[in-house]
């Protein structure tokens, strides 16, 4: 339901851009982030959890963005944007001798967002952000070794889609010639992913990403 509301808001903002004066923003973003994940492994489709793993990793990454800025009034703008992160990072790693060790990695993350912005003065503005993120998910390094219980799987690597909602707040400083600098904090809550291997063992992983980002861009 929340995803539908976000998509509806982005679509409505695009329609509104035809009515109000607007401009285009482009730029790049550098982020310091924390990725926390938890996972479980079940013995089979109806079994209880036998393995739990948690991971907390700090990292840095860069992205590029393009935006349409809708100037609704002297004090309020709405920005519709798309951000691309050419990243690959581990989301979860589950280990053990039960025949279903696996590494879960995410990459090529796209985020579509709406950014309502309140203009404090000619130099400073503050904003909130809500969006939807989607990326590639790879499940690889799946254990296929023989075990005493005969529980080894015969799986190959799997590709899935990683999706989640994004929320954030930030501030922007406007400079000369349309250049701006932003500082923002965002949180992405990814949907739980689920994978069942060839002998009915079930892997689930839940991930959350927090970013502190510095952006430099230009308006045209």
PLM features: what roles do these ranges have?
Residues 8-14:
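Bacterial N-terminal signal peptides
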Residues 2-8:
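Sec-dependent signal peptide recognition
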Residues 2, 18-220:
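Gram-negative outer-membrane beta-barrel domains
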